[in-house]
């Protein structure tokens, strides 16, 4: 694995090849930093703020998860889940009881674009029926690639690392605009994207291909392009995860990551994309549940760190937009303090929006207690009401900036004219065609000639192997599919090997084959063992890595290796085009690929990529 710190300083320097040195925080140009959105306060927003009770103000700072696919009705299981969390049945009732600032959608909330638009409109109607008539923030994680809550027929953008492999800021902006316009068409007004983390650790279990790469300058360029694209599409972009989640081997969903960068390393590697985003006046920044001792030695995660969020982000970087937490049900923020204390600590640190309160060990929602804790903190003097007002005003101002007070509704009659249009789908495919990276072609197997050869497609993913097999069959091959999953056992490996023996070619699909730990939550060595067993048959083997490009370090003897960075239909079509020479592989690695267990040795450098 890549955990040891031996030779790590040299490794960091190598992975961020080409990174431009940045000045210390004291050298940030205040004239270029984000100015306050308005020189004075907006009278309408101030009237709304003054009309709010303390409870209303505190509730406006929460963005909640709700179960179901409609604002007013829900399946019995969803009703039961909502009752455990909020004591009511559905989203409209949550609005009526608590008046929260907004909601976040997950995949379980989505059936199709028309359903989602109706859901969003139901939430906004419920908000409009309340005395304050404050529209709801409706947010989602729609990063593209492996993180997409809204699936086809919506357009599927290449993910961050794929776009960075294509090196086109034009594609990054265009696909963000398309994604933003399709989200706004279904009533979503905030996207928790783009990801500004600089992924310098191949063993990062939570970021990986969600990052634009290991080079701060490249990441900065792509992030700023996407900020403009999302805004043009009509949604609020949110860069994440400040102060930078790119160098960890711990998933903040399940543990507390520690980032061991020195202050100088942080300024050189992690800071530049966020600084660039602030210069673009990005509307929203999401915090990370990570501990960074060089920035705050207290051991508090950044989400709860006043030195990081106020001392650095507000005071030194002059950020004036909305600060939103990562989800509060993640272990990275729950480990040190009790759930009821976390919102107060986050607000004291400098947070504005509190995302997705958790359930307790009995499955009951903590949100009502967290809401009461914020109110009581003001009453006791632990927080001032002025501090709450600052955050509420920023939230209201952002809603106004997105036009929500004017018209928060989706036009349900126009969804088909915006979502998944032929023009949007074609743009996504063109972008994907620029991302596929041919990392190794030592045996000269590629490009393949169309024809009746027998091809085994095996490895990870029922739909992935089937889709890639279909694309190969369209080129005249006779394909056999043997899906083996993330953690193939010996029986599955033996079955794939037996199927390979009478084939002319084997295409093996891998997904994080580097994650070889034999522990719960990890893939184990099965994928690596599968590839090595297939190589031992003597059949020509082409490996297609459909997630992290680092897999080849676990089977460096493979002669032919492609990286697609995701497994969308567009990515797999592009891979097939490259396999058969219909498309010259244009992608270039946006990260370096180090040797297994030798992070100081780079197998394939940043920028590597072969052509025909």
Regions inferred by a protein language model and the residue ranges of each:
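N-terminal export and membrane-targeting signals
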Residues: 1-18
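Preference for extracellular/luminal or secreted protein segments
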Residues: 2-5, 22, 33-93, 315, ...
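Bacterial N-terminal signal peptides
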Residues: 15-26, 141
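Hydrophobic faces of well-ordered beta-strands that scaffold small-molecule active sites
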Residues: 59-66, 101-105, 136-142, 190-194, ...
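Solvent-exposed loop/turn segments at secondary-structure junctions
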Residues: 67-71, 108-112, 142-147, 190, ...
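Active-site-adjacent structural elements in enzyme catalytic domains
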Residues: 110-135, 167-187, 386-397, 433
């Amino acid at each position: 694995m890549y955990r040891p710190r031996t030779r790590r300083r040299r490794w960091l320097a190598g992975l961020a090849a080409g990174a431009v040195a940045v000045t210390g925080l004291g050298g940030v140009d205040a004239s270029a930093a984000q100015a306050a959105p308005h020189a004075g306060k907006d009278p309408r927003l101030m009237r709304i703020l003054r009309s709010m009770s303390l409870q209303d103000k505190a509730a406006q700072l929460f963005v909640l998860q709700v179960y179901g696919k409609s604002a007013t009705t829900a399946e019995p299981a969803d009703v039961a889940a909502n009752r455990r969390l909020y004591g009511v049945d559905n989203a409209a009732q949550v609005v009526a009881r608590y008046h929260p600032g907004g909601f976040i959608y997950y995949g379980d909330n989505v059936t199709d674009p028309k359903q989602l638009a109706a859901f969003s409109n139901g939430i906004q109607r419920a908000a409009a029926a309340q005395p304050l008539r404050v529209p709801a923030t409706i947010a989602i994680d729609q990063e593209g690639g492996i993180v997409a809550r809204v699936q086809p027929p919506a357009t599927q953008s290449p993910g961050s690392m794929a776009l960075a492999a294509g090196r086109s800021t034009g594609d990054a902006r265009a696909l963000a605009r398309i994604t933003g316009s399709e989200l706004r068409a279904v009533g979503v007004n905030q996207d928790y994207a783009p990801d500004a983390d600089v992924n310098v650790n191949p063993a990062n279990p939570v970021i990986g291909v969600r990052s634009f790469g290991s080079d701060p300058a490249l990441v900065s360029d792509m992030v700023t392009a996407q900020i403009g694209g999302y805004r043009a599409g009509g949604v609020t972009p949110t860069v994440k995860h400040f102060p930078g989640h790119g160098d960890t081997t711990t998933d903040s969903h399940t543990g507390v990551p520690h980032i061991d960068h020195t202050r100088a390393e942080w300024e050189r590697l992690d800071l530049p994309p966020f600084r660039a985003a602030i210069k673009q006046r990005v509307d929203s920044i999401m915090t990370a549940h990570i501990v960074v001792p060089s920035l705050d030695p207290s051991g508090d995660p950044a989400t709860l760190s006043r030195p990081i969020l106020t001392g650095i982000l507000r005071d030194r970087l002059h950020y004036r937009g909305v600060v939103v937490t990562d989800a509060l049900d993640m272990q990275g923020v729950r480990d040190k303090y009790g759930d009821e204390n976390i919102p107060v600590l986050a607000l004291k640190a400098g947070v504005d929006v509190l995302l997705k309160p958790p359930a307790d060990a009995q499955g009951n929602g903590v949100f009502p207690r967290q809401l009461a804790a914020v109110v009581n903190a003001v009453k006791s003097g632990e927080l001032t009401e002025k501090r709450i007002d600052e955050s509420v005003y920023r939230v209201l101002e952002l809603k106004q900036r997105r036009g929500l007070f004017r018209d928060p509704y989706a036009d349900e009659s126009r969804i088909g004219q915006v979502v998944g249009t032929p023009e949007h789908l074609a743009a996504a495919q063109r972008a994907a065609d620029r991302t596929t990276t041919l990392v190794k072609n030592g045996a000269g197997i590629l490009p393949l000639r169309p024809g009746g050869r027998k091809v085994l497609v095996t490895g990870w993913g029922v739909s992935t192997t089937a889709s890639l097999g279909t694309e190969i069959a369209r080129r005249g091959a006779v394909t056999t599919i043997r899906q083996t999953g993330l953690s193939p056992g010996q029986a599955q490996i033996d079955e794939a090997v037996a199927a390979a023996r009478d084939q002319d070619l084997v295409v093996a699909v891998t997904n994080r084959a580097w994650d070889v730990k034999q522990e719960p939550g990890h893939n184990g060595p099965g994928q690596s063992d599968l590839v090595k067993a297939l190589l031992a048959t003597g059949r020509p083997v082409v490996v297609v890595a459909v997630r992290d490009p680092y897999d080849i370090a676990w089977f460096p003897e493979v002669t032919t290796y492609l990286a697609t960075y995701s497994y969308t239909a567009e990515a797999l079509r592009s891979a097939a085009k490259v396999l058969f020479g219909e498309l010259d592989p244009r992608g270039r690695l946006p990260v370096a690929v180090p040797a297994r267990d030798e992070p100081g040795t780079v197998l394939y450098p940043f920028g590597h990529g072969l052509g025909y």
